[in-house]
């Protein structure tokens, strides 16, 4: 390795997945320092985002997390993490290779599945307001704030108040934002009035709709229509830089009559997407090509209900194929399909050892973890270091044995 110029090593390493680079740190001190260099980490992330290489799909099964490489899509691998195993650990978002993990509103973490670095967030109490009897639904979101170069977690806690609200639709919320750079929580005092109408039982409890969708330096949630309430579908966004709530305007063609449409949101090609489901018969997919510019909404494709599914209640695009001729769709939290944009045909992915029911999250391969690991998880990090040391020793002993046998073979000859 010493005979290869470091600029060439740098170029080679930029093309490798993060999991491989973690192992390459043991090659030499120069390699270790290069791979840990913040400029290299940033360049590696930039290349992955530009090329679409080394993407993986994270699957949340009933009790475990799994990953599958987008380039192969042949079988799943277990994702080991230090949060409680065999429990209700949820994945509530992804940003630049990091994912948000939740066991409870006070047991949260940011985790990099490629490097297995984790940062467990310091617990933040939930303070019940006056007149509140119980804590209700909790919304989460994870995103990168490019303005402050910081990763942030948003937690919105709904409170149920004993009142004469016959519809039971309006609730107060406690909104807190965690800064990874500061390693601290901050309460948002000014909360938009529309947030009080955000939660709807029959909508948000299904298909992970309570987890914020990241696009344009903001997290987004749908405020859905509901029976008995004069309200249209809305998209609520939380600006991670300003730490303020705003409303995202729909395309005019949709806004004029959106009462009978079920709406979902997602991200495709880095752009905010709106999925309009018409009576579970077909879904129009709109893309906001220039963020927060209403006129940039463009209908990019329509998906008819597949004959092979009984229900078409949820559909979400995840990623384009590299030739842009197909798009990977998640259907009803039960299957992944490639949708051909020209022929309009679907092909179901057959993934070995895949759970029968799951939620999917697109994750890039990166070396990012701004907090440099979890200070409260020393035991796990020591175990990982010991494991890496054992593997390195085995490789070293194997090399010595091979060298010995090679020399002995030459002596015999």
UniProtKB/Swiss-Prot annotation:
It is found in: Cytoplasm; Nucleus. It comes from the Eukaryota. SMART domains: FBOX. Disruption phenotype: Temperature dependent; normal at high temperature (above 28 degrees Celsius), but in colder temperature, dwarf morphology, constitutive resistance to the bacterial pathogen Pseudomonas syringae, and induction of defense-response gene expression such as PR-30. PROSITE patterns: FBOX. SUPFAM superfamilies: F-box domain. GO terms for cellular component: cytoplasm; nucleus. The F-box is necessary for the interaction with ASK proteins. Component of SCF(ASK-cullin-F-box) E3 ubiquitin ligase complexes, which may mediate the ubiquitination and subsequent proteasomal degradation of target proteins. Regulates negatively both salicylic acid (SA)-dependent and SA-independent defense signaling. Part of a SCF (ASK-cullin-F-box) protein ligase complex. Interacts with SKP1A/ASK1, SPK1B/ASK2, ASK9, ASK10, ASK11, ASK13, ASK14, ASK16, ASK17, ASK18 and ASK19. Interacts with TRAF1B. This is F-box protein CPR1.
């Amino acid at each position: 390795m010493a005979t290869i110029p470091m600029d060439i090593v740098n170029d080679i390493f930029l093309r490798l997945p993060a999991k491989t680079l973690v192992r390459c740190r043991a090659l030499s001190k120069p390699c270790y320092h290069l791979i840990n260099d913040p400029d290299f980490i940033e360049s590696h992330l930039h290349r992955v985002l530009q090329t679409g290489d080394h993407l993986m799909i994270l699957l949340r099964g009933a009790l475990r997390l799994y990953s599958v490489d987008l380039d192969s899509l042949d079988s799943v691998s277990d994702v080991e993490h230090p949060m409680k195993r065999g429990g209700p650990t949820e994945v509530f978002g992804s940003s630049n290779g990091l994912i948000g993990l939740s066991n409870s509103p006070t047991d949260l973490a940011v985790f990099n599945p490629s490097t297995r670095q984790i940062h467990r967030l310091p617990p933040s109490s939930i303070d019940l307001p006056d007149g509140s009897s119980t804590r209700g639904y909790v919304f989460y979101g994870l995103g990168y704030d490019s303005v402050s170069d910081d990763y942030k977690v948003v937690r919105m806690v709904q409170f149920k108040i004993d009142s004469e609200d016959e519809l039971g639709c309006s609730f107060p919320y406690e909104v807190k934002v965690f800064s990874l750079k500061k390693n601290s929580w901050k309460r948002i005092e000014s909360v938009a009035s529309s947030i009080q109408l955000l939660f709807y039982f029959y909508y948000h409890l299904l298909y992970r709709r309570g987890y914020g969708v990241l696009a344009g330096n903001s997290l987004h949630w749908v405020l859905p229509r509901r029976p008995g309430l004069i309200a249209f579908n809305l998209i609520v966004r939380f600006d991670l830089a300003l730490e303020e709530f705003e409303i995202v305007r729909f395309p005019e063609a949709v806004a004029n009559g959106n009462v009978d449409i079920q709406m979902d949101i997602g991200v495709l090609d880095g752009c905010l997407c709106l999925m309009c489901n018409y009576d579970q018969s077909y879904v129009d997919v709109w893309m906001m090509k220039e963020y927060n510019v209403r006129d940039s909404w463009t209908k990019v494709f329509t998906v008819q209900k597949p004959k092979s599914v009984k229900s078409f209640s949820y559909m979400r695009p995840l990623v384009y194929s590299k030739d842009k001729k197909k798009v990977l769709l998640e259907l009803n939290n039960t299957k992944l399909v490639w949708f051909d944009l020209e022929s309009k045909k679907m092909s179901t992915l057959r993934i070995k050892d895949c759970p029968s029911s799951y939620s999917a999250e697109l994750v890039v391969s990166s070396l990012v973890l701004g907090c440099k690991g979890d200070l409260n998880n020393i035991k796990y990090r020591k175990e990982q270091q010991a494991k890496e040391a054992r593997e390195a020793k085995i490789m070293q002993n194997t090399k010595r044995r091979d060298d010995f046998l090679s020399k002995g073979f030459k002596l015999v000859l």
